[in-house]
Regions:
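Bacterial N-terminal signal peptides
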Residues: 2-14
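N-terminal Sec/ER secretory leader and immediately downstream segment
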Residues: 20-131
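Non-transmembrane, amphipathic alpha-helical segments
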Residues: 73, 77-80, 84, 92-99, ...
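Generic structural concept
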Residues: 86-89, 108, 112, 151, ...
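Secondary-structure edge/capping motif, primarily at the C-terminal ends of alpha-helices
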Residues: 92-99, 118, 122, 157-161, ...
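Short, charged, amphipathic alpha-helical segments
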Residues: 105-109, 129, 169-172, 194-201, ...
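Extended amphipathic alpha-helical interaction segments
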Residues: 134-220
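A cross-kingdom marker for long, charged
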Residues: 215-267
Length: 267
């Protein structure tokens, strides 16, 4: 699978306006987006599950369940709810991929609570049983399908609520959780081939532009501004000179910034 290695877009760093949404590359779009003429719209965001297609090359990913306790209390801010929901979708895959299927019931429960708080609870209920069944069977393929459907149905519900910004934050939260897991795994067991998977400056650039183009009521929140600053720093950390291979020190820097971003996303 080469989806991660052909990921995202723009190399320019600027402040995107609401009318200048960064373009999403086709390989990050869920297949369903191509089945209807009206599928691509302001609510369309990169699929968290697509990110994991290539990350499976980094086996095992790094996983620590300690942060799941933080999700027991729901944040009041809807933007933080969305970011955390994205990290939970990613957690579901990482838990099974690393042999921690016993954590999936907790993750599924948190997913349902967060989706309900965002107004998308009814759609998510139907996926909870599937997540548990696939996790118990350790069926990563079907689990990814259920997680993709979870993200897609939340996206649809938010479309009905006319709240596209939250869809973008869910996607960002998922990518950050995946990146932290992958970068920590590569840091512990470094090879150039594994490290190459991480160095996607265009991905960091896309998400920096994406959150910069959100409604000012969200994009100007202090923690969002800080996350955007960190994403620009991550883009710099991921930049490799032509013909150069990533080094262990560069992987450590990516892991460090990714950890800062995930910590912010989980607040």
């Amino acid at each position: 699978m080469n989806l991660w290695l052909t990921l995202i877009l723009f190399l320019s760093i600027g402040i995107a306006t609401a009318d200048e949404k960064p373009e999403i590359p086709e390989d990050l779009l869920d297949d369903e987006h191509f089945r209807t003429e009206t599928a691509l719209n302001e609510f369309t965001v990169p699929s968290i599950v697509k990110v994991f297609d290539e990350l499976e090359k980094i086996s095992l990913l790094a996983y620590n369940s300690a942060h799941l306790k933080r999700h027991e209390r729901l944040p009041l801010d809807r933007s933080r709810l969305a970011l955390r929901l994205g990290t939970l979708i990613a957690d579901g895959f990482i838990a099974v991929q690393t042999g921690n299927s016993d954590d999936v019931p907790t993750i599924a429960s948190h997913l349902s609570r967060y989706a309900k708080a965002l107004g998308a609870g009814d759609r998510i209920k139907r996926h909870a049983a599937s997540l548990l069944d696939h996790a118990k069977a350790k069926d990563l393929v079907k689990l990814k399908g259920a997680l993709a459907a979870t993200q897609r149905d939340v996206e649809r519900e938010l479309a009905g609520l006319r709240d596209p910004d939250l869809s973008h934050l869910i996607s960002l939260g998922g990518w950050l959780q995946a990146l932290e897991s992958a970068s920590n795994a590569v840091e512990k067991k470094f090879t150039v081939e594994r490290a190459r998977t991480l160095f996607r400056e265009d991905v960091a650039d896309y998400y920096a532009e994406s959150i910069g183009s959100l409604n000012p009521s969200i994009s100007e929140k202090p923690y969002i501004l800080k996350m955007r600053e960190l994403l620009h720093g991550l883009r710099t950390a991921m930049s490799l000179e032509e013909g150069k291979e990533p080094t262990e020190e560069e992987v450590k820097e990516v892991a460090r910034v990714a950890s800062q971003l995930v910590t912010s996303a989980r607040q």
